Amino acid sequence: MKQSFQNTRYRAILLLTGLMLAMTAMAQTLTNDALDLSGMWRFQLDPMGFGKTPGSELYLDKLSETIMLPGSTDQGGKGIKNTARYVDRLSRKFEYQGAAWYQREVVIPEDWADREIYLKLERCHWETTVYVDDKEAGMKEHLSTPNTFVLTPLLAPGIHTLTICVNNTLKYPMDQWNHGTTEYTQTNWNGIAGDISLYAKEKAHIRQINVYPDVSSKAVEVSVQPAPLKTGQTGKLELCIREQGGKIIVRQTLNADSLQVHAGIRQTLPMGNRVKLWDEFTPYLYEIEASWNVDGKTDTQTRTFGMRNVEQGKHHIRLNGRDIHLRGVLDCAVFPLTGYPSTNVDDWKRIF
């Protein structure tokens, strides 16, 4: 009788484990080498900031609450309930300042075994630390641009626990009227408001391209950062700049070994004597295409850029040798329902 009970118990545990794995797999959507991680996450507030303290590490625990992402703690009803209502600023239903922890399982496909894996967290507020299982993967604090983490060494195929600590404590000196953290424009919200995804790339790929126009020399300096090569490997980089109509201005090819790739590849490309400058009235753009080939596999990326020179004048900012006046509108509190800026293109089209 006892043996039968134990067998039944073990079968039940195996069944529940299988169901949990299936639910985890269903909660992530694989599309075009990317895993969409939006949806329900486990959650826990950490107002005292003990979650990174040895012996109290929250990334080692299974968090007890839940919250939807993308979103904020305000939207999830987390924090201190606020009954005050204001006429001169946004009125938050819930307020929270401090560390908040978000957690879920992810399933890495088998065909990602020999690829570079990145985590993209768009529009975080603010300091964001990522953990995979029991290892810290890094910390970033970008606001308007995505926080991107390289997780390749930590994500073998299979199931892993991904934990993210977002801390909206004001760690830098701020003016009391600043637009990034006060209710007069948005709020000091905590969360991740945009794209949350894992994506995979071939080992041979371009991580970053930067273009630096130099109007005085009629040239651009191009900085290309490929993913690291193995010792002894070499890659071939082809750079091509085109006018808007497609006419090729310059094309160059160069080889790089693992040490050069580690340092980053920089190359100056001439734009010719008839280079067209960019300003708000004649916003002429060029396109640069970078193709990186390693062992027969190629990653090609493009960027657009304008040739312009910005400098400080006596009383004005100067653009291409002329004094300019910058104009704009003060779009305060244009997202009152969320308290944070949208990452949806249609929302910005409506405003513009």
Residue ranges and their predicted role:
Residues M1-G18, A25-F352:
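Secreted/periplasmic carbohydrate-active enzymes, especially glycoside hydrolases
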